[in-house]
């Protein structure tokens, strides 16, 4: 593995996942053939989105990658301020320890597909870190571009792109000019600060959200 630190917070973990593992996951994806989320695609979010939580084998393999990337990124990044208990945050899960949660999503971009400027978020949970895993690189275009850092990341198969979920790291998926782009995405949160809308704040879930936001 090679770690590229573009900024304090935007990291690439190159060669983090082997080609064999990726091909195995893509084979499982084709076998299970998850249902496409038809409602996700619009003029700002041009991609085919699949939620894979209904397929335990597929989801477990994705979590293996996401958990490993998350543990490395959080523990090794000195600018992520959990220094007093980082090890505890990755202890075996039980009712007294931190558990990271999220939702594994596979996105397929066809030729001319793109994803306009957006910030990653969840409508109900306080997501902290976003992970984009590039499942292939045999396509043209399709880079990930960050607005404020004026940074463009070229997808590389087996690489994990890591960055915080906040209002600074606005990014986009550049148009795919040839071929098909495939990614696995998850933005994770800690269950002990999970935010569930309850009365008298239930109306908060009905507040209009920008279509340019990435929601689960």
Regions found by a protein language model. Give the residues of each.
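Fe(II)/2-oxoglutarate oxygenase catalytic core
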Residues: 1-160, 168-216
């Amino acid at each position: 593995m090679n770690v590229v630190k573009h900024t304090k917070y935007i990291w690439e973990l190159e060669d983090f996942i082997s080609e064999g593992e990726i091909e195995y996951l893509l084979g499982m994806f084709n076998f299970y053939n998850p249902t496409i989320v038809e409602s996700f695609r619009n003029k700002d979010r041009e991609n085919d989105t699949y939620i894979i939580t209904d397929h335990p084998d597929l989801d477990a393999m994705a979590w293996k990658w996401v958990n490993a990337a998350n543990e490395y990124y959080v523990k090794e990044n000195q600018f992520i301020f959990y220094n007093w208990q980082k090890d505890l945050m990755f202890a075996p899960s039980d009712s007294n320890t931190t558990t990271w949660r999220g939702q594994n999503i596979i996105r397929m971009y066809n030729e001319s597909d793109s994803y306009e400027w957006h910030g990653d978020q969840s409508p109900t949970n306080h997501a902290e870190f976003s992970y984009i895993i590039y499942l292939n690189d045999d396509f043209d275009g399709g880079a990930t571009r960050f607005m404020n850092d004026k940074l463009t990341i070229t997808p590389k198969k087996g690489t994990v792109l890591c960055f915080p979920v906040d209002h600074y790291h606005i990014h986009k998926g550049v148009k795919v000019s040839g071929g098909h782009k495939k990614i696995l995405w998850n933005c994770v949160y800690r269950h002990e600060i999970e935010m569930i809308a309850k009365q008298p704040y239930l109306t908060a879930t009905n507040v209009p959200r920008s279509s340019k936001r990435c929601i689960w």
